[in-house]
Amino acid sequence: MHTTQKDTTYTKIFVGGLPYHTTDASLRKYFEVFGDIEEAVVITDRQTGKSRGYGFVTMADRAAAERACKDPNPIIDGRKANVNLAYLGAKPRIMQPGFAFGVQQLHPALIQRPFGIPAHYVYPQAFVQPGVVIPHVQPTAAAASTTPYIDYTGAAYAQYSAAAAAAAAAAAYDQYPYAASPAAAGYVTTGGYSYAVQQPITAAAPGTAAAAAAAAAAAAAFGQYQPQQLQTDRMQ
């Protein structure tokens, strides 16, 4: 006669994490409180006969197996074990909260910004050495404070020189009170030289002999003065 094998899918329980001194009898004794037991066996090594630390318990019905698996980590023979239906496989142990290790989360403000000079501090250029990290400066502020010194070279110096020369010429011109004449308008008067003061010419009616004579006298008087040659060493 062929015996029909009973389906133990929902009644056979895997018990892991057993101490080495647990036997079939002690395993059965623990699960008897949940219902009738058909089989309780501890798996041992064939050569040494010692327990391998796990076993199987077959309950009589599915309800008893569910009651036995309600606590997934029971204490069997003084050691915490793990219990689950055999077809589901071994169930990992639940770690105690006191033994759980985690990685502490860091605040985003502590990891986003690299170490260096804070952005809200501004250091003068005279104290910053090459290679030191300099915080970002707005383009408008950088254009206004690129250097602590005033630029006296290039166009700025040429403008300053022209203004100084004009002021010096005006001061020298005030020291020599003579009437301006059309012939001397193109020449620059410099200090250190004296000129004869021209007497004012009496105005005469145009087209008369007196007017022609006055014009000839003025031409003769100004013809005696040659244009002054500027020396190169005074222009430096």
From Swiss-Prot:
- What is the tissue specificity? Expressed strongly in heart and skeletal muscles. Weakly expressed in intestine, aorta, liver, lung, kidney, uterus and bladder.
Tell me a GO biological process for this protein: positive regulation of myoblast differentiation
Note whether Phosphoprotein occurs among the keywords. Answer: no
> What domain notes does the record hold?
The RRM domain is necessary for mRNA stability and mRNA translation regulation.
Q: Which CDD domains match?
A: RRM_RBM24_RBM38_like
> Quaternary state and partners of this protein?
Interacts with EIF4E; this interaction prevents EIF4E from binding to p53/TP53 mRNA and inhibits the assembly of translation initiation complex.
Q: Which UniProt keywords apply?
A: Cytoplasm, Differentiation, mRNA processing, mRNA splicing, Nucleus, RNA-binding, Translation regulation
Induction line: Up-regulated during embryonic stem cell (ESC) differentiation into cardiomyocytes. Down-regulated by microRNA-222 (miR-222) in skeletal muscle cells, leading in inhibition of muscle-specific pre-mRNA alternative splicing events and myoblast fusion.
Disruption-associated phenotype: Mice die in utero between embryonic days 12.5 and 14.5. Show multiple cardiac malformations, including defective endocardial cushion morphogenesis, ventricular septum defects, reduced trabeculation and compaction and dilated atria. Display loss of sarcomeres in cardiomyocytes. Show aberrant pre-mRNA alternative splicing of key genes necessary for sarcomere formation and cardiogenesis.
Q: State the compartments where it is located.
A: Nucleus; Cytoplasm
Q: Name one GO molecular function term.
A: mRNA 3'-UTR binding
Q: Supply the Pfam families for this chain.
A: RRM_1 (PF00076)
**Role of this protein:** Multifunctional RNA-binding protein involved in the regulation of pre-mRNA splicing, mRNA stability and mRNA translation important for cell fate decision and differentiation. Plays a major role in pre-mRNA alternative splicing regulation. Mediates preferentially muscle-specific exon inclusion in numerous mRNAs important for striated cardiac and skeletal muscle cell differentiation. Binds to intronic splicing enhancer (ISE) composed of stretches of GU-rich motifs localized in flanking intron of exon that will be included by alternative splicing.
Name assigned to this protein: RNA-binding protein 24
Which Gene Ontology cellular-component terms appear in the entry? cytoplasm; cytosol; nucleoplasm
Instruction: Using the record's annotation, list all stretches that form the RRM domain.
Output: 11-88
What residue spans carry the region label Necessary for interaction with EIF4E? 175-199
Q: Which domain of life is it from?
A: Eukaryota
